[in-house]
Amino acid sequence: ITESSSWLSEEVVGGKTPKIEKNNNKVLIPVDFSGYSLKACEFGFNLAQNIDAEAVLLHVYFTPIYATSLPYGDIFNYQLSDEENVRNILQKVHADLKALSAKVKEKVISGEFPDIKYSCVLREGIPEEEILRYVKEYRPRIIVMGTRGKNQKDFDLIGSVTAEVIERSHIPVFAIPENIPFKRFTEAKRIAFITNFDQR
């Protein structure tokens, strides 16, 4: 797993694992560079300001090749082209992260986002699994994420990653639609509580 508290750090490219402070007074915001992610950032930053917490923007990228999962004999056949493919994926992830980071900074400067302390984490793996693993390791107070990812179909009410996180998370999860008409939780005038009376 590659994990970094700074998206654009050379430590990520070099494969090092920077230390991350364990402070559970955080709002976790999983991002995937879609419009849903930016809306989730807006809500997450405002919520973090309201509860005097920090925000953590987490992106999980997936590489199709894991040398450690290959049969022992096949590890020696691991081709340079595969390593180059992984590096290309990392470069693309960094470019996307840089673009999102610039958007967040612009919105902070313009006053659209509150000027709070935030950090960025990059992990390799399956998104829902790494989000839940991060929650287990660092115990943030709440998760704020988009209802759908950028690759979801228009008719999907909620994406598979978000649905899995909601189902399995032991901390509260706010799923934010991209077209929600307000910017803060404090602007909500009515709350609908939907339940099947399951004990969870």
Model-inferred region functions:
Residues S37, V93, I158-T162:
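Short, conserved glycine- and acidic-residue-centered signature motifs
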Residues W7-P18, K22, F62-I65, Q91, ...:
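Structural beta-alpha unit
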Residues K183-E187:
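Glycine-rich, charge-decorated loop segments at or immediately adjacent to ligand/cofactor-binding or catalytic sites
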Residues Y78-D96:
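A short acidic, glycine-rich active-site loop
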Residues S6-W7, S34, F62, G125, ...:
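Residue-level marker for beta-strand->alpha-helix junctions and adjacent short loops that shape enzyme
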Residues I1-K16, E129-P181:
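Gly/Ser-rich helix-loop-strand patches that form or flank binding pockets
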Residues V56-L58, S119-R123, F174:
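General small-molecule cofactor/ligand-binding pocket signal
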Residues K19-E83, I109, A188-R200:
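Small/aliphatic-rich secondary-structure junction motif
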